[in-house]
């Protein structure tokens, strides 16, 4: 399986990079994993609704250009469906079983994702009703993907 994480913005925090690199290394035994960072749009502190929509549209274009046409797309959204670790593992297992070998997870920028990206999504996934920094979500997401593969293989890790 090919797992791609498309995320808006550049990861700056060293401790997050180290954690992500560790899980990416662990995942190599199960899947090919790549992380694509698309540029975030420069935006002033205060914006009108139209300006926010334009920022999301531009970031959305960059996200969509990074997604293969045959990929199964999972967007991370506050209003998405909440799944437990076992349910996410089952979903990834089902995708592999039914020939969906390319799975793309999308983490939007600070304003969220555009409507075009939402329309391209096959599954809107929520980790919580709370808001998290999108850089931190990369680490949380890649850990959950790793956990999913361990669950699906019946290997110890999941508790």
From Swiss-Prot:
Point out the coiled-coil segments of this chain: none
Listed disulfide bonds for this chain? none
Q: Which Pfam families match?
A: SPOUT_MTase
Task: List ligand-binding residues for S-adenosyl-L-methionine.
Answer: 76, 108, 127-132
Keyword annotations: Cytoplasm, Methyltransferase, rRNA processing, S-adenosyl-L-methionine, Transferase
Q: Which reaction does it catalyse?
A: pseudouridine(1915) in 23S rRNA + S-adenosyl-L-methionine = N(3)-methylpseudouridine(1915) in 23S rRNA + S-adenosyl-L-homocysteine + H(+)
What GO cellular-component annotations does this UniProt entry give?
cytoplasm
**What Gene Ontology terms describe what this protein does at the molecular function level?**
rRNA (pseudouridine-N3-)-methyltransferase activity
Question: Where does it live in the cell?
Answer: Cytoplasm
Report the EC number(s), separated by commas if there are several: 2.1.1.177
Transferase is among the record's keywords: yes
Whether S-adenosyl-L-methionine counts among this entry's keywords is: yes
Q: How does it assemble?
A: Homodimer.
HAMAP family with a match to the protein in the record: 23SrRNA_methyltr_H
PANTHER family attached to this UniProt entry:
METHYLTRANSFERASE (PTHR33603), RIBOSOMAL RNA LARGE SUBUNIT METHYLTRANSFERASE H (PTHR33603:SF1)
Q: Which family does it belong to?
A: Belongs to the RNA methyltransferase RlmH family.
Role according to the record: Specifically methylates the pseudouridine at position 1915 (m3Psi1915) in 23S rRNA.
Q: What is this protein called?
A: Ribosomal RNA large subunit methyltransferase H
Tell me which species this is from.
Answer: Oceanobacillus iheyensis (strain DSM 14371 / CIP 107618 / JCM 11309 / KCTC 3954 / HTE831)
């Amino acid at each position: 399986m090919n797992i791609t994480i498309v995320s808006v913005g550049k990861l700056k925090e060293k401790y997050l990079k180290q954690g992500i690199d560790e899980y990416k290394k662990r995942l190599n035994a199960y899947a090919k994993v790549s992380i694509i960072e698309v540029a975030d749009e420069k935006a002033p502190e205060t914006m009108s609704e139209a300006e926010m929509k334009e920022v999301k549209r531009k970031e959305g274009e960059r996200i969509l250009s990074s997604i293969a046409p045959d990929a199964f797309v999972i967007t991370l959204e506050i209003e998405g469906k909440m799944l437990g670790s076992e349910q996410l593992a089952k979903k990834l297992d089902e995708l592999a079983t039914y020939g969906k070998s390319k799975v793309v997870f999308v983490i939007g920028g600070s304003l969220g994702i555009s409507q075009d990206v939402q329309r391209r999504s096959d599954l809107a996934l929520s980790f919580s009703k709370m808001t998290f920094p999108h850089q931190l979500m990369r680490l949380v997401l890649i850990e959950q993907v790793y956990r999913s593969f361990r669950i699906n293989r019946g290997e110890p890790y999941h508790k």
